[in-house]
Amino acid sequence: MPFKKINLLILLTIIISLTVLAFSQTSPPRTASSGVNGWKKLTTEPFRGKQDDVFFVTPDVGWYVNGSGKIYKTIDGGSSWALKLNKPGTYFRAIGFIDQQRGFAGNIGTNYFPNVTDTTPLYETSDGGETWKPVAGVTEQMIKGICAIEIVKKPFINAGKLDYKATIYAGGRVGSPAFLLKSEDNGASWQSIDMSRYCQMILDVKFFDEKNGVISAGTDADVQKSNALILTTGDGGKTWTKRYQSNRPYELTWKSSFPTRKVGYITVQNYNPDKNATERVVAKTMDGGKTWKEILLVNDFNVREFGIGFIDEKRGWVGGTMSGYETTDGGKTWKPVEMGKAVNKIRLLKTENGFVGYAVGIDLYKLEYLNK
């Protein structure tokens, strides 16, 4: 790797590290409290920095992961959490489960963040997260690191019972290289797809079924040259089509949310040091990812976007540097809401009477909404 490229990657790493450190130093103690908009901060173990992913299989059973190599589990909707894995040197960036027993956790890999020594890209559990082991046959040659895990379940009849066949995708990573893992047999075997002809960074992966999917990406490993990029596939990841590319440097798309098959939103991250570059935008599609338009989130140089989640086509949230943002009109207008700092992932699950939401960043927040 050229010396200049290494220096630029180190610079980006330092910027991200200093940013999340600043968040953590101003973060209050982690005790349960209520936000004015209904988001409630849950009691969790203190962590200095941005935590990256949370996943729930039911409104009550879920897990979250962070960069210190820890995986936590709750069975009571976040009222209490149990530490299930503590693996220093591992940076868990993503987590996903097929059901309450079988799941996967992705590691960012080495040569990006400091103090990360684990080269194992992907871990798995078959007992609800009580124990974890490296996924057999998946090496760093297949994928250097993982930023997102997506699981698509298709129902089928198995010996007279309704069962599910899972197709699993794991993509990465920030800073390059760009690879996509795919399993079509519940994680028993894996194939690696080299994405370097299409993009240089993969930040999020969304699939609607086994064939049709969307990737949030960056055009260049050098962030000062990178444009935000969105790709789609209709053949299970064999080929990809560019659907959106920003015309600004220092950008990449970060996280996605599709409340319906047609309507979707993706955060556009901006690292431009020019203080005149103040617009922060979200990409929106209304035709399933074929075309995209930019909608203004906020005009503020100090804001960086992270996670995003929409419960329907109109109402959703974006995690920002110091607070979150909420819209109830499909992104036409946004208002600040207290849901934690640097929220990197928002998970929303529908319930009988409404929905429940979880948002992880510096802290972990929960929203319970009942239909009127």
Residue ranges and their predicted role:
Residues 61-63, 101-105, 160-169, 211-215, ...:
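Entry beta-strands of beta-propeller and related beta-repeat scaffolds
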Residues 30-43, 69-85, 121-138, 181-194, ...:
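Asp-box/BNR beta-propeller loop motif
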Residues 299-323:
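Loop/turn-rich, solvent-exposed surfaces of beta-rich toroidal or solenoidal domains
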Residues 66, 106-109, 170-173, 216-219, ...:
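Recurrent small/Gly-Pro-centered beta-turn motifs in extracellular repeat architectures
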Residues 50-53, 91-96, 143-151, 200-206, ...:
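Repeated scaffold domains used in trafficking and secretory/extracellular systems
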Residues 110-114, 174-177, 220-223, 271-274, ...:
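Short glycine/acidic-enriched loop and turn motifs that connect beta-strands
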Residues 43-68:
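Beta-strand-rich domains and repeat architectures in extracellular enzymes and scaffolds
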Residues 347-372:
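Blade-level signature of beta-propeller repeat domains, shared across WD40, Kelch, NHL, RCC1
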